[in-house]
């Protein structure tokens, strides 16, 4: 692995810490290059890992291995009577969004509990699992390329994830794959691995139990140890015409609230400082359960978005909400933010502003209503940061429709914006809509949108100069004496950074600092820390 100057997140397992991967290594080696990202903002040429149109959490064989190699440090001392026979090694490639990343974490955790190890490269793996993405056509191609690379470099490959629904397509292109499963088919993946690479025999010492000795309650995480994604539901009840997620992952299925809170508490106990709440439709949480009441810590809790937010707040760590639809009950959650009970950050995929295009998309919102809601939220919580994504060049989009979107952005003054040009996805209803927009027009509109938003972002960040902010340290460059941090306004991977100069040796990754903002660019802040 190449040398790097930044200080890695500590991955050594203590009894109260989850295994995790250093964020530094996240882009050093990818079997399948992340070319399947949607068109990204104009900042990507300068900051290639930020301001993405979607969360992209690609992880490679090498990166996945570092997670469990950290866990081996614990088992070396905690299970000295473990079998001397080498455990089989599984390679892992994880493509796509944070929801898929959580699926990968769960599969790796279960395999590790069964005594498997994670390989550091294709050649050292007894088998490779590829967790695929099928959200847009370029993601499909990236996944197929990753499968092909795994087959050519290893030969024994199991495919899972969203593209697994297209098993015939996968087998037609790659007939050598051993098994294909769909999204969140955890047990099917575990069984397929065990079929082709039998579980290790731990019978030499009956006291050795990898389910107890290897992994703690928090499980293995593919994120740095100070933040983690917490998935609260799967699937979606909406039928947006550009999206095939419901056909890949099904209708909304919410986790009972006690299950969510048990995982959240385990992550806090493991040292996590920030929880990123994710799902396909976060604010619809509990709808399918009819808001069933469960008991947690002796208290009744409804499986309801607002109640969940209240309970998560009581943990006393950062809680960040992603993929929130602007339903009316979100207003009450913003009130919690105004009371300093949640991070004042909302990731809401508005997608467009033209009523005609929103109707063609089958989106459950109207631009005038969303503008009114944004203004109301800022009255309730003046510090609120709003991130959104938009589709440019949707079929039938006219210049008038696009100008409506630009005018809306001027009025809304969003803090963070990602965008991508529309592309066909096999199975999407929008493919059959008339008047598709030429590619050159899509790109020209995309660039105009991002230029406008860049100016808005720069203006908003200039207003931060001279103020103090609490930031969370993600990385440290000891040679330069700079801490790379995030404030409440910055989600990992997709938003900006706060660069803090002249830090001392006592500053650590995962630590909170109170800093003074000295300068700003279009997307990042620059600060000083007095200790």
Swiss-Prot record:
- List, alphabetically, the GO terms of the cellular component aspect: cytosol
- List the subcellular locations: Cytoplasm
Its Enzyme Commission number?
Answer: 2.8.4.4
Q: Which GO terms describe its biological process?
A: tRNA modification
**Residues involved in [4Fe-4S] cluster 2 binding:** 236, 240, 243
The record lists the catalysed reaction(s) as:
L-aspartate(89)-[ribosomal protein uS12]-hydrogen + (sulfur carrier)-SH + AH2 + 2 S-adenosyl-L-methionine = 3-methylsulfanyl-L-aspartate(89)-[ribosomal protein uS12]-hydrogen + (sulfur carrier)-H + 5'-deoxyadenosine + L-methionine + A + S-adenosyl-L-homocysteine + 2 H(+)
According to the UniProt entry, its GO molecular function terms are: 4 iron, 4 sulfur cluster binding; aspartic acid methylthiotransferase activity; metal ion binding; protein methylthiotransferase activity
UniProt-annotated stretches for the region Disordered:
1-77
Q: Specify the MTTase N-terminal domain's residue ranges.
A: 88-198
Q: Where is the composition biased (Polar residues)?
A: 1-19, 55-67
Keywords of this protein's UniProt record, alphabetized?
4Fe-4S, Cytoplasm, Iron, Iron-sulfur, Metal-binding, S-adenosyl-L-methionine, Transferase
Low complexity biased stretches: 68-77
> Which cofactor does the UniProt annotation name?
[4Fe-4S] cluster
Q: What is its main location?
A: cytoplasm
Which InterPro entries has this protein been placed in? Answer: Elp3/MiaA/NifB-like_rSAM (IPR006638), Methylthiotransferase (IPR005839), Methylthiotransferase_CS (IPR020612), Methylthiotransferase_N (IPR013848), Methylthiotransferase_N_sf (IPR038135), NA-bd_OB-fold (IPR012340), Ribosomal_uS12_MeSTrfase_RimO (IPR005840), rSAM (IPR007197)
Cross-referenced SMART domains: Elp3
Q: Binding positions for [4Fe-4S] cluster 1? A: 97, 133, 162
Q: Where in this chain does the record put each Radical SAM core domain?
A: 222-459
The note describing how and how many cofactors are bound reads: Binds 2 [4Fe-4S] clusters. One cluster is coordinated with 3 cysteines and an exchangeable S-adenosyl-L-methionine.
Role of this protein: Catalyzes the methylthiolation of an aspartic acid residue of ribosomal protein uS12.
Q: Which family would the database say this protein is a member of?
A: Belongs to the methylthiotransferase family. RimO subfamily.
Can you name this protein? Ribosomal protein uS12 methylthiotransferase RimO
Native source species = Psychrobacter cryohalolentis (strain ATCC BAA-1226 / DSM 17306 / VKM B-2378 / K5)
Lineage here is: Bacteria, Pseudomonadati, Pseudomonadota, Gammaproteobacteria, Moraxellales
Which gene does this sequence derive from? rimO
């Amino acid at each position: 692995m190449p040398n790097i100057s930044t200080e890695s997140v500590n991955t050594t397992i203590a009894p109260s810490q989850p295994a995790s991967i250093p964020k530094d290594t996240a882009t050093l080696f990818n079997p399948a290059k992340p070319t399947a990202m949607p068109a990204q903002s104009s900042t990507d040429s300068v900051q290639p890992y930020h301001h993405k149109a979607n969360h992209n959490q690609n992880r490679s064989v090498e990166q996945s291995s570092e997670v469990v190699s950290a866990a081996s440090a614990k088992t070396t001392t905690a299970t000295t009577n473990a079998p001397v026979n080498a455990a089989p090694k599984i390679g892992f490639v994880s493509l796509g969004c944070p929801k898929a990343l959580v699926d990968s974490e769960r599969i790796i955790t279960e395999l590790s509990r069964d005594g498997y190890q994670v390989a550091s490269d294709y050649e050292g793996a007894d088998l490779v699992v590829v967790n695929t993405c099928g959200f847009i056509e370029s993601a499909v191609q990236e996944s197929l390329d990753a499968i092909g690379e795994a087959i050519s470099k290893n030969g024994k490959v199991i495919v899972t994830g969203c593209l697994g629904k297209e098993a015939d397509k996968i087998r037609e292109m790659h007939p050598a794959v051993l098994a294909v499963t769909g999204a969140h088919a955890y047990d099917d993946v575990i069984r397929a691995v065990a079929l082709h690479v039998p579980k290790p025999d731990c019978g030499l010492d009956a006291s050795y139990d990898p389910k107890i000795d290897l992994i703690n309650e928090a499980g293995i995480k593919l994120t740095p140890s100070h933040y983690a994604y917490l998935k609260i539901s799967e699937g979606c009840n909406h039928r947006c015409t550009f999206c095939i997620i419901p056909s890949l992952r099904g209708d909304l299925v919410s986790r009972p609230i006690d299950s969510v809170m048990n995982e959240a508490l385990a992550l806090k106990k493991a040292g996590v400082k920030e929880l990123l709440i994710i799902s396909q439709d976060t604010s619809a949480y509990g709808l399918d359960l009819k808001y069933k009441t469960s008991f947690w810590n002796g208290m009744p809790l409804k499986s309801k978005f607002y109640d969940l937010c209240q309970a998560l707040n009581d943990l006393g760590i950062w809680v960040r909400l992603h993929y929130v639809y602007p339903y009316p009950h979100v207003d009450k959650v913003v009130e919690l933010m105004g009371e300093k009970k949640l991070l004042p950050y909302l990731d809401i995929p508005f997608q467009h502003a033209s009523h005609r295009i929103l109707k063609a998309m089958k989106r459950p919102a109207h631009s005038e209503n969303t503008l009114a809601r944004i203004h109301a939220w800022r009255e309730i919580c003046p510090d609120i940061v709003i991130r959104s994504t938009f589709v440019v060049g949707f079929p039938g989009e006219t210049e008038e429709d696009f100008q409506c979107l630009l005018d809306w952005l001027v009025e809304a003054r969003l803090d963070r914006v990602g965008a991508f040009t529309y592309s066909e996805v096999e199975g999407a209803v929008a493919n059959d809509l008339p008047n598709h927009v030429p590619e050159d027009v899509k790109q020209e509109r995309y660039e105009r949108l991002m230029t406008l938003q860049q100016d808005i972002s720069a203006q908003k960040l200039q207003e931060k100069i001279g103020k103090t902010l609490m930031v969370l340290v993600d990385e440290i460059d000891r040679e330069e004496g700079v801490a790379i941090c995030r404030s409440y306004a910055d989600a990992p991977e997709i938003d900006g950074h706060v660069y803090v100069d002249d830090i001392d040796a006592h500053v650590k990754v995962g630590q909170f600092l109170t800093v003074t903002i000295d300068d700003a660019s279009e997307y990042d802040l620059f600060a000083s820390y007095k200790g």
